[in-house]
Amino acid sequence: STLMRSSAASDVYKRQTQARREEIINACAQLYETMGFKDVTIKEIGKITSFTRTSIYNYFQTKEEIFLALIGREFDLWSDALEQALAEEQTLDRARLAEILADTLSARTLMLKILSMNMFEIEENSSVEQLTAFKRTFGRSFACVDALLAKAAPELDAAARRAFAYSFFPFMYGIYPYTAVTEKQRAAMDAIGFGYSVYTVRTLIQQTAQLLLAGTTPEK
């Protein structure tokens, strides 16, 4: 029937749109591995996609919206891993939760890099519609961490769990620079005799999560 043909055509269009969005996001991620944020432009992205730069504007209005979709995808992957841990961990305590946070986030260094380096600019230059979609994705991760904490420390009430989240999530914005020290930064710190330590992403997260979890107690 005409209705069925129309529905099938709509499904094909949706799949094609999603595939093209993914291709653009993948190209952005590929460029960001070797280029600075300011050098990743829609023109550069267009050079490594199968369609023209002009066509990119059918899917994203600014390069910041592409980055927003990229970090949104990263947050979704993190949430997937957290939900899997929630389903698989029969017994969970605070020490194991710190390990889970460290393991799952150390697999998402791209997300941590964008969070610490460019997030304000990305949000500022994205539409309210795109930003709303991202905040929904971010909220899912927030809820996953809350659910894991509720399972690991059932004695904590919602206010105490929220206090942990409002310490841990801001910390995430600062992880990357402490784990990716450039030669220039290293030389400057050596010049002033600054005794610094370079941590792996996993070690820094596990250590900080353990400290925050140890200090999280039920609200009076």
Across the structure, where does each feature detected by a protein language model lie?
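C-terminal peripheral helix-coil segments that are non-catalytic and often amphipathic
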Residues: 140-155, 174-220
